[in-house]
């Protein structure tokens, strides 16, 4: 597992295999990552909070909970996403925004979820530009929004 806290900068490549908790956790940071590969996490594969994030390419498989979790007033942009085997592929919550430009999601009951988890925050918003997911694989709580442009 890797955890960045209050980090700023660019990362070329991250590879994580067999994590017993969240595989990659980034908090209070401003990070641009070119490529992320994660396999086999007991909890979330990628967990982002309180920051601004750009991920160019992410390929994740076998996430115990969420493939990607964006929360606590974060802004995140994902250019190319592949997620295989997660409960929720991409969850955005608690006054956060995520833009997902190109996603392929397989074996995940919920592709995208936008909601408020913690009382002190508002809902969340996801903008999806291209995906193989269907509308019935979306979860949107009142006060949150998902814009789907296929």
Model segments located where?
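Extracellular beta-rich repeat passengers
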Residues: 1-150
């Amino acid at each position: 597992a890797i955890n960045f806290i209050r980090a700023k900068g660019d990362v070329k490549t991250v590879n994580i295999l067999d994590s017993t908790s969240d595989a990659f956790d980034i908090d209070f940071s401003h990070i641009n990552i070119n490529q992320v590969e994660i396999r086999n996490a007991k909890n979330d594969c990628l967990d982002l909070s309180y920051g601004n994030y750009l991920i160019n390419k992410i390929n994740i498989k076998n996430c115990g909970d969420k493939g990607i979790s964006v929360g606590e007033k974060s802004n995140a942009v994902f250019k190319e996403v592949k997620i295989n085997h997660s409960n929720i592929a991409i969850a955005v919550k608690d006054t956060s925004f995520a833009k997902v430009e190109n996603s392929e999601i397989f074996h995940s009951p919920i592709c995208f979820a936008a909601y408020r988890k913690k009382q002190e925050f508002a809902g969340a918003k996801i903008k999806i530009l291209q995906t193989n997911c269907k509308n019935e694989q979306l979860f949107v709580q009142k006060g949150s929004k998902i814009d789907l442009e296929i």
